[in-house]
A protein has these predicted regions:
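C-terminal alpha-helical cap of glycosyltransferases
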Residues: 353-372
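Conserved donor-binding/catalytic loop of nucleotide-activated donor transferases
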Residues: 118, 265-267, 281-292, 312
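Acidic donor-binding loop of glycosyltransferase active sites
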Residues: 97-99, 265-279, 287
Length: 372
């Protein structure tokens, strides 16, 4: 067999799975430029565009997740899984990987399950503090399990766990501009406290309604300003509302912020959902954060992610059902509290794992070398 490394990386569905996957691939390629890397994702999901844009080949499986509310619909899902296992087997036979890496998401289940049945060593990358069902099943045969939180032996064999942290998207740790320039780029005033609200690329209704319900409070702030990513799903509705009510001068809003490094550089305080990837970014940057976990995720894992930080005084937690009423007043009080900001920043920075992508790449490469 050739000396080149051949590695499959499977998963996706959301940026929280895709960014770590690409970061791992980039780290492998930096260390071993000759490595052949193939992604396996889910047809119709964002990885089918994001991965090729990052310079990697991807194969798609016609996979979908289980419907946890309407169980009768899962008959079709089971049939798709059977089909996807056959397709994954064909991909694995053609590509002949020495290692298969799973980062979570619909495609990782059948791909890694088939890889394990074919004797291909697997590496799991579990981003959350509460492991999902698929990873718990795959972990029984996984060679290595890379995690971002302490205490994951609750879910996985302790002798195969490695505390690596979560890889984050490229470019965050080397901001392209100063805080002053970053604030100016959003049309806001340097020297004022700045709150960044991000509800994900599609948006978060509760967080958006918190802003819309507190526009008079926002307008009344003379020393606090806001950068608000509304999400594409709510764009038309919010544009119409702002046209009707008038946009405060101290509020910048957009359906999507493509340059998150600049947005983070501008922010004194962040308000966000509690996805594992986002939390890893806040840790790496030492950003004070208020977390509003999404109630619409499997096993309520975002709440568990948030509480893992709250237990270490590294974040503030607001339940989704309370956000409409309490989120904006709390954010304004917090961003004006220097001692609180400093404490949050220091404590969250302690949780950072800045070398996560390189550490995981080293694990994958070492395993591949032994398998060749």
């Amino acid at each position: 067999m050739s000396d080149e490394l051949r590695i499959i990386i499977s998963g996706g569905g959301t940026g929280g799975h895709i960014f770590p996957a690409v970061s791992i691939a980039d780290a492998i390629r930096r260390k071993r430029p000759e490595a052949k890397i193939l992604f396996v994702g889910a047809e119709g999901r964002m990885e089918m565009q994001r991965v090729p844009a990052a310079g990697y080949e991807i194969k798609g499986l016609p996979i979908a997740g289980f419907d946890r509310k309407r169980l009768w619909r899962n008959i079709a899902v089971v049939m798709k899984i059977i089909k996807c296992r056959k397709l994954a087997a064909g991909i694995l036979k053609d590509f002949r990987p020495q290692v298969a890496v799973g980062v979570g998401g619909y495609a990782s289940g059948p791909t890694l399950n088939v890889a394990e049945s074919m004797g291909v060593p697997t590496v799991l990358q579990e981003q959350n503090s509460y492991a999902g069902v698929t990873n718990k099943l795959l972990a029984k045969k996984a060679a290595k399990i890379c995690v971002a939180y302490d205490g994951m032996e609750r879910f996985f064999p302790a002798d195969r766990i490695l505390l690596t942290g979560n890889p984050v998207r490229a470019g965050l740790t080397a901001p392209k501009c100063t805080n002053e320039d970053a604030v100016k780029s959003f049309g806001l005033q340097p020297g004022k406290r700045t709150v960044l609200l991000i509800g994900g690329s599609l948006g978060a209704r509760t967080m958006n309604e918190s802003v819309l319900g507190n526009l008079p409070l926002i307008k009344a702030q003379t020393d606090v300003q806001f950068i608000w990513q509304t999400g594409k799903y709510y764009s038309a509705e919010i544009n119409e509302e702002m046209s009707r009510r008038g946009k405060p001068d101290n509020l910048y809003f957009s359906d999507f912020i493509s340059d998150m490094a600049t947005a983070y550089a501008a922010a004194d305080l962040v308000i966000s959902r509690a996805g594992a990837g986002s939390i890893s970014e806040f840790c790496l940057l030492g950003k004070p954060v208020i977390l509003v976990p999404s109630p619409n995720v499997a096993e309520d894992h975002q709440t568990k992610n948030a509480l893992a930080l709250v237990q270490k005084d590294a974040a503030i937690y607001v339940p989704d059902e309370n956000a409409r009423r309490t989120l904006l007043p709390l954010a304004i009080n917090t961003v004006n509290d220097n001692a609180k900001l400093q404490s949050l920043a220091e404590n969250i920075l302690k949780l950072a794992k800045p070398n996560a992508a390189d550490d995981i790449a080293d694990i994958v490469i070492a395993l591949a070398e032994r398998t060749k």
